[in-house]
């Protein structure tokens, strides 16, 4: 349940209830407890309220510097983090590094050293190599927020997905949540599997076998509520939430798929298939959507779609992460 | 010079010896094993009470990095590390720069080792010129210069016809082709063992088939050519089974396994630990059990470290960019003793796989090493099987501090290493 404050006094009460945060960094959701996920949700609720005020800014992180360090092109995620930082009154330093410069010559650690010397208190980083934020967190003082690393994790996206679902459903307990697409190489899917299963959802992953993490089937101890399914009709049938994933064109080049058209034929969520889900089910997507590939245009813009809400909620969730990791008590 | 080693538990798998006795070394040779050899006229007496005394270890697979990568290791630092690990003969791989594919480079390695004058360095030359997988290296000339085998280690010889020729041509000089088995297409981009953990960490997996396809092809070519095939660092249960069947069919194949593949699993990679990034990757407990079974039934002939030293910066980077390899010479015995202490391997079998086993891969020419027969070369290691110590890479002789065992407590410690009758290492 998300708690949205109704008065300024509510804001303080709700935030004062959030206690015991222990993460300096947000690298993945695998080490988040259910209670910690609830803390993020409660804090994000407060932040969403702040964002709906006439003056969408609080001084919580005034005097702090947050750097965004992106080794992959990104408009949405980087802007969302930037806006979140500014809404908390932090100063923002944006660094875009071309992917081609990832080499041992211009090392990530050198760049982080420079950012720290410039006074960055927190670094939001996106990197094409899995685990890069761990290298950063182990070797520098700033708080590291992972904005996506390789195929590994995209924790803030999964948190905003959970937050968005909770704006429509009272709880995730027992919900059937279906993820369709390149599960194996999707950091969004990976973080969602951790986050959604800790929130008590039953997860169905749907893709052709080249894009399915079959290892999940053989280790049910870690993810007892995860089911793999190659038939989209079965996967969507009775679902409370259906989440599409962006199909990267390079998957075809690397031989995992014969082509985009064939993929769409068997794995596109269209109106007809969506009818198999529960009537009040939600359609989600981390964006940007390849329309008429993973989702049909009518589904993207249909009544059940909460894709635009996800974008809005993303700012609130990222504010919550900054706020919690900074240890600030002011708002 | 006479050295007398008193009262140690002498284990010599070549002669089946395992009893407490004294060992006498004279003029660089083993001259006798007996109860109560007289101390008279011996310059040096070593009390080995409670210790194991066995032939100096032979390592079929090390990387000494010189020439070309002296920041990672030199022949001198590598030899010191080997001596500290109880190794008295080591076979450096030819992936240097320039590659060890011709006489001048082999001569340089041998001459440098002679100057260092610690232990025996038996170079392996490249199968192909420049390790490029296109043309055979001058194997005859290299054999004459004293190389012990041919390998493009680090890379698989992708061309089947070229490998067939390599096996046929090297057979002329009775030297083994030592293959790094890895299907290049399947291996591309792979960073760790394929499985749930790889998926969780978002790292591209290396499947068992990547190795087994290559092992299978090479065995077929060994059969066809009649040449000698030695398989480097096999890591999967499937590979063990393929070698077992090949040996049963009488094909001339031998195999080695590393200490890390025998003792560590893929779980070491958790947290993107680059010191556990190695190729072939650390596998699973099932594979470990199969590799141990392979040692026991003779499928696997030797334990070889694949000592792969790297600089700090080679490993202090993103997992995907980090170099493959573990610095293994100085922890090999102690980590393997874990298998003895847990009852998975007998002490005599372990010693066999570090002495007699690799000697047999090297061939008859080297039958004066790897054993303690009277008249054999006085290569001897004395170790305490029960001494506990904590791995501290700052104290390594190797320049490569890259090991996942840093800070770990191990049981079993090399006390003295003697090579050709000279004491080359004494634990402080």
Swiss-Prot record, chain A:
Keywords: Pyrimidine biosynthesis, Transferase. It is an enzyme of class 2 (transferase). L-aspartate binds at residues 104, 187, 246. Carbamoyl phosphate binds at residues 76-77, 126, 154, 157, 287-288. One of its GO terms (cellular component) is cytosol. InterPro entries: Asp/Orn_carbamoyltranf_P-bd, Asp/Orn_carbamoylTrfase, Asp/Orn_carbamoylTrfase_sf, Asp_carbamoyltransf, Asp_carbamoyltransf_Asp/Orn-bd. It comes from the Bacteria. It holds the Pfam family OTCace_N. Transmembrane segments: none annotated. Catalyzes the condensation of carbamoyl phosphate and aspartate to form carbamoyl aspartate and inorganic phosphate, the committed step in the de novo pyrimidine nucleotide biosynthesis pathway. This is Aspartate carbamoyltransferase catalytic subunit.
């Amino acid at each position: 349940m998300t708690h949205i404050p109704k008065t300024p006094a509510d804001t303080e009460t709700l935030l004062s209830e959030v206690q015991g945060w222990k993460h300096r960094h947000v690298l993945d959701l695998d080490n988040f407890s259910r209670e910690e996920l609830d803390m993020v949700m409660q804090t994000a609720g407060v932040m969403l309220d702040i964002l709906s005020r006439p003056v969408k800014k609080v001084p919580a992180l005034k005097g702090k510097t947050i750097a965004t360090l992106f080794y992959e092109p990104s408009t949405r995620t980087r802007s969302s983090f930037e806006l979140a930082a500014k809404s908390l009154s932090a100063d923002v330093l944006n660094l875009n590094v071309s992917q081609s410069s990832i080499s041992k010559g211009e090392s990530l650690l050198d760049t982080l050293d420079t950012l720290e010397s410039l006074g960055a208190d927190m670094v939001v980083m996106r990197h094409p190599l899995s685990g890069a934020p761990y290298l950063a967190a182990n070797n520098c003082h700033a708080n590291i927020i992972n904005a996506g690393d390789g195929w590994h994790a995209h924790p803030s996206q999964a948190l905003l997905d959970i937050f968005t679902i909770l704006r429509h459903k009272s709880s995730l307990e027992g919900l059937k949540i279906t993820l369709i697409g390149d599960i194996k190489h999707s950091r969004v899917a990976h973080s969602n599997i951790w986050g959604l299963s800790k929130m008590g959802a039953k997860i169905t992953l749907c893709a052709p076998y080249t894009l399915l993490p079959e290892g999940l089937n053989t280790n049910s101890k870690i993810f007892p509520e995860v089911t793999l399914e190659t038939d989209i009709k079965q996967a969507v049938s009775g679902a409370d939430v259906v989440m599409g994933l962006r199909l990267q064109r390079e998957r075809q080049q690397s031989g995992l798929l014969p082509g985009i058209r064939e993929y769409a034929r068997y794995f596109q969520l269209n109106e007809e298939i969506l009818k198999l889900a529960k009537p009040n089910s939600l359609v989600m997507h981390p964006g940007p959507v390849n329309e008429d590939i993973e989702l049909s245009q009518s589904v993207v813009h249909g009544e059940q779609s909460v894709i635009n809400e996800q974008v809005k909620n993303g700012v609130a969730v990222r504010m919550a992460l900054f706020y919690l990791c900074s240890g600030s008590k002011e708002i | 010079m006479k050295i007398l080693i008193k009262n140690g538990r002498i284990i010599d798998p070549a002669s089946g010896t395992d009893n407490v006795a004294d060992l006498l070394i004279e003029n660089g040779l083993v001259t006798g094993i007996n109860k109560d050899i007289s101390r008279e006229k011996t310059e040096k007496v070593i009390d080995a009470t409670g210790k194991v005394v066995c032939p100096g270890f032979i390592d079929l697979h090390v990387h000494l990095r010189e020439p070309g990568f002296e920041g990672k290791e030199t022949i001198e630092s590598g030899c010191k590390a080997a001596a500290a690990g109880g190794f008295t003969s080591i076979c450096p791989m030819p992936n240097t720069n320039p590659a060890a594919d011709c006489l001048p480079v082999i001569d340089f390695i041998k001459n440098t080792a002679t100057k260092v004058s610690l232990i025996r360095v038996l170079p392996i030359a490249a199968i192909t010129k420049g390790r490029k997988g296109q043309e055979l290296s001058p194997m005859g000339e290299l054999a004459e210069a004293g190389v012990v085998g041919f390998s493009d280690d680090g890379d698989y010889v992708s061309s089947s016809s070229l490998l067939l020729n390599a096996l046929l041509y090297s057979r002329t000089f009775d030297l083994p082709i030592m293959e790094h088995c890895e299907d290049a297409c399947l291996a591309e981009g792979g960073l760790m063992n394929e499985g749930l953990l790889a998926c969780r960490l978002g790292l591209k997996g290396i499947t068992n088939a990547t190795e087994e396809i290559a092992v299978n092809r090479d065995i077929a070519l060994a059969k066809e050519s009649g040449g000698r095939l030695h398989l480097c660092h096999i890591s999967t249960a499937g590979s063990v089974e393929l070698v077992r069947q090949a040996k049963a069919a009488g094909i001339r194949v031998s195999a080695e396994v590393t200490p890390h593949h025998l003792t560590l699993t893929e779980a070491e990679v958790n947290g993107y630990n680059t010191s556990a990034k190695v190729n072939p990757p650390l596998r699973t407990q099932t594979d470990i059990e199969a590799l141990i079974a392979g040692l026991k039934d003779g499928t696997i002939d030797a334990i070889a470290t694949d000592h792969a030293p790297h600089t700090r910066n080679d490993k202090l980077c993103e997992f995907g960019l980090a170099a493959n390899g573990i610095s293994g010479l100085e922890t090999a015995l102690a980590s393997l003793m874990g298998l003895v202490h847990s009852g998975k391997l007998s002490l005599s079998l372990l010693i066999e796989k570090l002495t007699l086993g690799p000697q047999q891969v090297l061939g008859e020419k080297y039958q004066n090493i790897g054993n303690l027969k009277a008249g054999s070369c006085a290569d001897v290691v004395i170790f305490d099987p029960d001494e506990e110590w904590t791995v501290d890479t700052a104290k390594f002789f190797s320049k490569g501090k890259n090991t996942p065992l840093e800070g770990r407590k191990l049981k079993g410690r090399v006390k003295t290493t003697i090579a050709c009758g000279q004491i080359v290492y004494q634990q402080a």
